C-alpha cells in the first residue's frame, strides 16, 4: 500500500515541475550598446565639421558640440544659414553670445544669431560690408574684421548698432571711413589706404565715449579734425602728415585749455618736424612721439 501511495505521489508531482525558461539578458544590453554607437557617430560627425582651430581647443569643441546636439529641431531650423545651407554655428564656432569665424576663407559676413554680442571674423577674404549684414543684429558690442580685404562699407552699415563699443577694421583696403556708431570706445583702422579726404570733418566729433583711436600706417595728409575730448590714445604714426595747426589738438583762442584725458599721441614716421609746431602741443600733458629735429 505504501508503495502504491509513493508511486501515485511521484506520478502526480512530476508533470507539475518544468524547467524555467531561459532569462533574456542580452537584448537590453544590445539596444543600449547600439544607441551608444549611433550617438558616438553623431558626435564624431559634428566634430569633424568644426574648423581646425576649434578642434585644437578641446574645451570649446566639447561644450559647443554638446549644446548643439541638445538643440531640438525647431531651434536648428531657426538658425541662419549661408548660401550653402550650412548653419553659421557649424561653419563658425558659436559660444555664449560670441561667434568666431577666423581664418575660414569666407568672402562675406555670415548670417548671425540674433543674440550675437561679439563677432570675430579676422583673417578671411571679406571684401564688402552691407547694410543688410547687421540689419537685425542690435546686440553687437564688439566686431573684429582685422586682416580681410574690405574695400567698401555701405553707408549706414553700422547705424543700427547702438550698443557697439569696439570696432576693428585694421589691415584692410579701405580708402574712406564709414559713419561710426555713437557709443564706440575703441576704433582701429590701422594699415589701410585711408587719405584725409576719406574722413569727414565731423567723423569723430559726436563720439563722446571714444578713448582709443588707431589710424596708423595709412595715407593721411593731416590730423583728423574735431577730435573728441574723451580721447586718451591717438595713433597716427607712418602717414603722410605734413602740417599741424594750433587748433589741431588745442584751442588757439583759449590759452588755459588743457586736454586732461590725452595720454599718448604717436606721430613718428610722418614727414613733419614737430619742433616747428610747439604751440600746437601747449595744451597736452605729454608731447607727441615723433621727429622733432
UniProtKB/Swiss-Prot annotation:
Organs and tissues of expression: Expressed in many tissues.
Subcellular locations according to the entry: Secreted, Extracellular space, Extracellular matrix
UniProt keyword terms in alphabetical order: Disulfide bond, Extracellular matrix, Glycoprotein, Growth factor, Leucine-rich repeat, Proteoglycan, Repeat, Secreted, Signal
Glycosylation sites: 60, 240, 253
GO terms under biological process: articular cartilage development; bone development
Signal peptide: 1-19
Gene Ontology MF annotations: growth factor activity
Taxonomy, superkingdom: Eukaryota
GO cellular component: extracellular matrix; extracellular space
Mapped LRR repeat ranges: 107-126, 127-150, 151-174, 175-194, 195-220, 221-241, 242-272
Disulfide bond annotation, renumbered to this chain: 250-283
Post-translational note: Contains keratan sulfate.
Described purpose of this protein according to its UniProt entry: Induces bone formation in conjunction with TGF-beta-1 or TGF-beta-2.
Family: Belongs to the small leucine-rich proteoglycan (SLRP) family. SLRP class III subfamily.
Entry protein name: Mimecan
Gene: OGN
Amino acid at each position: 500500500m505504501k508503495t502504491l501511495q509513493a508511486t501515485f505521489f511521484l506520478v502526480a508531482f512530476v508533470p507539475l515541475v518544468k524547467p524555467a525558461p531561459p532569462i533574456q539578458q542580452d537584448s537590453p544590453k544590445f539596444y543600449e550598446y547600439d544607441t551608444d554607437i549611433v550617438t558616438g557617430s553623431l558626435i564624431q560627425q559634428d566634430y569633424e565639421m568644426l574648423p581646425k582651430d576649434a578642434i585644437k581647443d578641446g574645451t570649446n569643441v566639447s561644450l559647443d558640440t554638446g549644446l548643439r546636439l541638445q538643440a531640438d529641431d525647431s531651434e536648428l531650423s531657426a538658425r541662419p544659414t549661408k548660401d550653402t545651407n550650412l548653419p553659421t554655428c557649424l561653419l563658425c564656432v558659436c559660444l555664449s553670445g560670441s561667434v568666431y569665424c577666423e581664418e575660414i576663407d569666407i568672402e562675406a559676413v555670415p548670417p548671425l544669431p540674433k543674440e550675437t554680442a561679439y563677432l570675430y571674423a579676422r583673417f578671411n577674404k571679406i571684401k564688402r560690408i552691407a547694410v543688410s549684414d547687421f540689419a537685425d543684429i542690435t546686440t553687437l558690442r564688439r566686431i573684429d574684421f582685422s586682416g580681410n580685404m574690405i574695400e567698401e562699407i555701405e553707408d549706414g552699415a553700422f547705424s543700427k548698432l547702438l550698443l557697439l563699443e569696439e570696432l576693428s577694421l585694421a589691415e584692410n583696403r579701405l580708402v574712406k571711413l564709414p559713419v561710426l556708431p555713437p557709443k564706440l570706445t575703441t576704433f582701429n583702422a590701422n594699415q589701410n589706404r585711408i587719405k584725409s579726404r576719406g574722413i569727414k570733418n565731423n567723423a569723430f566729433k559726436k563720439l563722446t565715449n571714444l578713448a582709443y583711436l588707431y589710424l596708423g600706417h595709412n595715407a593721411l595728409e593731416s590730423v583728423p579734425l574735431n577730435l573728441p575730448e574723451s580721447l586718451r590714445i591717438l595713433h597716427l604714426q607712418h602717414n603722410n602728415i605734413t602740417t599741424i595747426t594750433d587748433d589741431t589738438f588745442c584751442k588757439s583762442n583759449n590759452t588755459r585749455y588743457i586736454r586732461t584725458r590725452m595720454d599718448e599721441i604717436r606721430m613718428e614716421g610722418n614727414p613733419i618736424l614737430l619742433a616747428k609746431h610747439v604751440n600746437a602741443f601747449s595744451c597736452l600733458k605729454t608731447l607727441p612721439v615723433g621727429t622733432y629735429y
